[in-house]
Regions:
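Transmembrane beta-strands of outer-membrane beta-barrel proteins
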Residues: 1-8, 36, 53-57, 91-95, ...
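Membrane-spanning beta-strand positions in outer-membrane beta-barrel proteins
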Residues: 1-2, 44, 87-89, 187-189
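Transmembrane beta-barrel wall of Gram-negative outer-membrane proteins
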Residues: 1-23
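C-terminal outer-membrane beta-barrel translocator/porin domains of Gram-negative envelope proteins
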Residues: 20-21, 28-151, 163, 209
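Outer-membrane beta-barrel "beta-signal"
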Residues: 32-35, 179-183, 199-210
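Small/polar, glycine/serine/threonine/aspartate-rich low-complexity segments that form flexible
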Residues: 163-171
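A short, acidic, flexible beta-alpha connecting loop/helix-capping segment that sits on the rim
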Residues: 193-199
Length: 210
């Protein structure tokens, strides 16, 4: 568990397209409490174990907000091997501002790889959300030591919702599949996804996948 205070500044400005969130500029300040339990067998691509992470913020200053407000988000992940080369994974997460609406800018976003992959990055946004993800991981080959570790095939199903999001479908969900490599530069994932209401994407990602 960790307790502290975060301080910074936030400035939003439209450069192209139609404005979706307010234009704000100012100080951000929040007391923060973080809880983390990590019982996974690998920090990058786990095959066994579980993780629980929860963050609570009390924002006393945020550009555009009319008063102080709370934010809580929690994520739970579970990994279970079914053979030497294969494993399943499940994750669930959610967050809320507990009814606080005048937060200046939205506090939660969905869309992009691993967060409704068929949707555009941060396409859905609001102050309360949930996301479920379940999938299968299968080891394909091992890389030379100077290149990385292993390469996996990954398939997953994702479903989530952002309450109050503009133009959101009744049930945002998708299927995603691709190849994940644990390289010397970090995990690299390339794949595609097909979802509801004609959403579909090809994508690649360098960085944390789980």
């Amino acid at each position: 568990m960790r307790v502290g205070y975060d301080v910074g500044s936030l400035s939003t400005k439209l450069r192209l397209g139609t404005p979706q969130i307010p234009t704000v500029d100012g100080r951000v300040g929040a007391a923060r409490m973080r809880y983390l339990m990590d019982r996974a067998d690998d920090p990058v691509i786990p095959r066994r174990g579980f993780r629980v992470e929860s963050n609570f913020h009390w924002f006393d200053a945020s550009p555009g907000a009319t008063s102080a407000f709370p934010v809580l988000d929690t994520r739970i992940e579970f990994f279970q091997p079914v053979s030497r080369a294969a494993s399943f994974f499940l994750s669930s997460e959610g967050g809320s501002t507990f009814g606080s609406r005048n937060t200046g800018v939205p506090q939660f976003f969905l869309g992009g790889p691993g967060r409704l992959s068929a949707y555009g990055v941060n396409e859905l946004f609001g102050n309360q959300y949930y996301l479920f993800r379940g999938g299968y991981l299968h080891e394909l080959v091992s890389l030379p030591p100077f290149v990385g570790k292993k390469v996996y095939a990954v398939g997953s199903y994702e479903a989530g919702k952002v309450y109050g999001a503009v133009n959101e479908s009744r049930f945002p969900n998708d299927f995603a599949a691709g190849v994940l490599a644990e390289t010397a530069l970090g995990p690299f994932f390339v794949g595609g996804s097909v979802g509801d209401s004609s959403h579909h994407k090809w994508f690649f990602q360098l960085g944390r996948v789980f």
